[in-house]
Structure formats: C-alpha cells, structure tokens
C-alpha cells in the first residue's frame, strides 16, 4: 500500500498548472528552452543498434513538450491545460526510476512491418543494469496497451523502477548498462557515455 510519504515523493517532481508559463512568457523564453531541449534530448538518447532508440525523459523535457503543445494548439482554458499535464506528467521520473520513450525506427515501410511482427514483446525485454546489481526490466505502456496480437508498436513508454541498492550505487558513481534481451534484437551498451550517465543520475537525486 502506498504511504503518504510515497505519495509525496511520487508527486514532488510533477509539473503543475501554476508552474507553467503563459503563452506570452513562453514565446519569449522559447528559443533558449528549445536549444536546451535539443541538447538534453541528444545527451539522454541511447541508441541500441541502428533501429532502437531510448529517449530518457525528465522534468524539463516534459515541461518543454507541454509548453510546445499549448503554444501550437493555442490552449488557454484550464481543462485543455490539465489534459496536457495528465498526458505528459506520467513520463516525469519520480526519483526512484527512469522513464523512457522507446522508438523502433525503420525508414522502409515494408522492413518496418516485418520487424514489428518479429519483435513482438520487445518492450518487455528492455533492461538497465547498474554495476554490481541485478538487471531491472521495464514496465511498459502502463497507460494503455500499444501492441496487438500480431505486432509490436513502433513507440513504447517504459519505466525502470530501481531497487534502493541500485539507486545508491548509481549515486555513488557506479556505471550502468542499457540493453535489450529480445532474441531477434539482442543488443546492449556496456557503459553509458559520461554525460548521459550524469544526466540520468540527476533523475534520482
């Protein structure tokens, strides 16, 4: 059962209506926010081979995405703003986990259809492994099921919930492996780039 303390921890990093900029304020801040978002997304993207990318999301990237959606759709009313918050807040890390958007990318449509059929269940074979700790497998698509009975989806939303020991090891400077165990796409990165690891560790502090 979730305690009050856990509830507070799970909401402390969430984006609130009050913390968002007005459309006018965002218009002025947008060039710098966009520049930072591009840089952070580059640092926080882990490529596993040619066709699989994991984009590890954080509070800033989700805040930027919300502000962009409000700008593009010219949303002013409270209900519309809350809809965007409800859509993107689940991808903000809670302090004990990593949240990632997983993308399977094949330029050729025929290749993509074939691959998505062969890679059924791949979203459940994604893992992170902190140095000296057991592998942590992803919880996938907790909002709704994206795969069908014949193929996986090209986009999945993942949560890697870290045991306390793994979190402590990362905060103490341990390395972390990211990988996929699917028999049709066995791939891993033994050591993350320093900038990527440093950025991910900030999700835990």
For the regions a protein language model found, what residue spans apply to each?
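Methionine residue identity
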Residues: 1-2
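Long, contiguous binding/interaction regions
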Residues: 8-99, 105-205
């Amino acid at each position: 059962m979730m305690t009050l303390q856990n509830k507070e921890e799970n909401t402390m990093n969430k984006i609130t209506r009050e913390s968002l900029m007005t459309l006018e304020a965002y218009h002025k801040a947008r060039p710098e926010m966009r520049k930072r978002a591009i840089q952070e997304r580059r640092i926080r993207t882990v490529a596993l081979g040619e066709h699989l990318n994991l984009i590890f999301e954080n509070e800033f990237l989700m805040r930027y995405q919300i502000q962009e959606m409000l700008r593009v759709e010219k949303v002013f009313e409270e209900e519309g703003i809350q809809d965007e918050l409800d859509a993107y807040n689940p991808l903000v890390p809670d302090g004990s986990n990593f949240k990632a958007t997983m993308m399977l990318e094949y330029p050729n449509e025929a290749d993509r259809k074939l691959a998505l059929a062969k890679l059924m269940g791949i979203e459940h074979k994604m893992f992170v492994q902190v140095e000296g700790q057991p592998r942590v497998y992803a919880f996938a698509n907790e909002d709704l099921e994206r795969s069908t009975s014949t193929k996986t989806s090209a986009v999945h939303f993942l949560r890697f919930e870290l045991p306390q020991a793994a979190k402590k090891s990362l905060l103490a400077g341990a390395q972390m492996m990211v990988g996929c165990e699917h028999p049709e796409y066995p791939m891993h990165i033994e050591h993350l780039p320093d900038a990527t690891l440093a950025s991910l560790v900030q999700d835990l502090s």
